[in-house]
């Protein structure tokens, strides 16, 4: 599953949406920004094996929490990633938090920086922890 999503995301998405031009222009571009529905379903199905193991050890609540957390993360990722690619003048695009996170994501779209800086699309926390936030002068 990962190679399919990577092959679609890296060459297409990063070629079309560049650092200073990340806004979608047409609703048909949703396919370039969002994970395909089958990808979401595959992610959900991949959570079921660990959940089944947890369930087998009488940890049903933990199993449900695991699936809910994984899917919550994926849906949050999708919503935030979409919001970064909406026009900056849209209602969502004007939200302060979205604006700040869009700037962080724009560095990820710079071809000279994307392999080294700003990997986390949803929340820069792990970029901060791992030291992969791009220096301010970039």
Report each predicted region and the residues it spans:
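Membrane-embedded catalytic scaffold of the fatty acid hydroxylase/desaturase
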Residues: 1-63, 71-78, 82-138
């Amino acid at each position: 599953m990962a190679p399919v999503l990577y092959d679609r995301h890296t060459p297409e998405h990063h070629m079309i949406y560049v650092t200073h031009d990340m806004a979608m222009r047409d609703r048909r571009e949703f396919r370039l920004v969002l994970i395909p529905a089958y990808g979401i379903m595959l992610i959900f199905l991949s959570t079921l094996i660990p959940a089944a193991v947890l369930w087998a050890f009488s940890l049903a609540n933990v199993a449900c929490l695991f699936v809910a957390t994984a899917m919550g993360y994926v849906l949050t990722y999708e919503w935030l990633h979409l919001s970064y690619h909406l026009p900056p003048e849209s209602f969502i695009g004007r939200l302060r938090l979205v604006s700040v996170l869009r700037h962080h994501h724009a560095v990820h779209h710079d071809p000279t920086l994307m392999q080294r800086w700003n990997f986390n699309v949803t929340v820069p926390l792990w970029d901060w922890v791992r030291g992969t936030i791009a220096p301010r002068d970039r």
